[in-house]
Amino acid sequence: EMIRLEVVLRNIAAGSLAKRLGMEVGTTLPAPILEFYYKSDALGDPLLNEYHVRALGLASSEELRAIRETTFRANGVLLPFFAEREILLADFKLEFGRQKGALLVGDELTPDGCRFWDRTTRENLGKDRARRSLAREATAYQEIFRRVCT
């Protein structure tokens, strides 16, 4: 059973965060920001806080604690992994689900769900680049693959 939340962790201001708060795109955040979005096409996937999540019955306090810990732990592993490959991880999203009472990550990390930038040029390597055209999507995936696997 998937939880109807997208969990977004942001290390660098970009996308909706930069727009919503009037921040300059590319600003390194002094601390990562964790956001929750309600997965509802009808409502436009609104931003929620933890009180909303609990009030809507989407996740318990214990599940939210585990989601926070897992997401921050993933960030702690991913940041140095990508930095060694000259990639900045601006942000990424995770989704979670439940199986037999256990909370599980129910999503994968791909350029579609991550905002990757070249560490030196800050060129988009992930979802921003891929969204501009299908032809560039393959190139974006290939560049990430090259850096991760070589």
PLM features per residue range, with description:
Residues 1-91, 98-150:
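Acidic/polar, glycine-anchored loop/turn motif associated with catalytic or activation segments
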